[in-house]
Amino acid sequence: LSPKPGFAGLPDIPAPLRGTYAGAAMMAPYLGALGLTVIELLPVHETDSDQVGAHAGSTNHWGYQTLAFFAPNRDYSSDKSLGGPTREFKEMVAAFHAAGLKVYLDVVYNHSAEGGNWADSPDAAGFTSLGGFATADYYGLDAAGGLIDGATGTSNQMNYSSPLSCALVLDSLEYWHGVMGVDGFRFDLAPVLGRR
């Protein structure tokens, strides 16, 4: 339900709502009538993917560079007001539930939008996501203190030897389930979460 090529002509969705949580909610009755029981959304955590590409000038709209694990991506919200993306996301989930669909999220906890090979220097650890707060607790570091890419191939690797990182994931999952109403999760590169 993205405004990207291939989805631009969805019927019955007003142009300003295409690619938004509100637009997706409008599709709920149709998807339920098809007999679907679950909808899985690609990552919806706040991200900086459109600003930080692998190469200068490139963009990435997939959402796999998480910036904030507790915030719905405001780019997918028609309501940009304070709290608007959260309200709109919850309304979308309610619409899917009313149509008999469960909502699963594709979640990315193996890495974040922090530095690494996406930055100007692969040794960079900045203040994009969690770096600078407790970098060694959140990220795997090499002997020189630089971020390691490890098994993710995507910029850095979260440090799940750290209780702080483990708590972040559990708290985030509890939030998305208990507060936002999400029913299940698909974990990107799930084996990385078990590495110590």
Sequence positions of predicted segments:
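Substrate-binding/active-site clefts of carbohydrate-active enzymes
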Residues: 2-181, 189-196
